[in-house]
Amino acid sequence: SLKDFKHFLDEAETRGMEVALDIAFQCAPDHPWVKKHPRWFCWRPDGTVQYAENPPKKYQDILPINFESDDWKNLWDELKSVFEYWIKQGVKVFRVDNPHTKSMEFWRWCILNIKAKHPEVIFLAEAFTRPKRKYFLAKSGFTHGYTYFTWRNTATELQQYVEELTQSESKEYFWPNFCPNTPDNLHADLQTGNRATFIGRYVLADTLTTNAG
């Protein structure tokens, strides 16, 4: 219940922790929006769902949102209200799922409006994508973004990557997050590694950035 959730927030705060909510803008087939606003979703010409694919995965059980719908203004307002609702409940951190597969114009508009009223709110982009796409998300307002740190393993790879993040133009707008919380996207060493492997990786992340974890 919402009462339980608020208690959870309070308990986390007493322990010096911040609760982050995962925001995934997509819907189940039985969501009220599907019947009330069918134009908000992606459909094939034959009327079937134009579901997302990330080979070999096929997400056939969820409906992707059409950010360029002819009713986009109402859609965008409704999506923004999701953030506003949880901010009202006391949430200040959002980890956004796959933002690079959504409209960049939406993120720029949404985050700008949210931060105008709530500048303390943090947006983390869970984006495993091309560097330019990551940087575009940062320029669109995301506070932090996922990186390729997990896949840089040799001393040379790590040095080159950290130099790229700290000595190139991107340092002006991209704040990297070095430890992703997506288990199925970990490097092979971490997928099969023991406790010492993870501790070593975290110490390295904590040494190289102010935003690890």
List each model region and its residues.
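Active-site beta->alpha N-cap acidic-glycine motif
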Residues: I23-F25
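Alpha-amylase-like alpha-glycosidases and glucanotransferases acting on alpha-linked glucans and related
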Residues: S1-D10, T14-M17, C27-G213
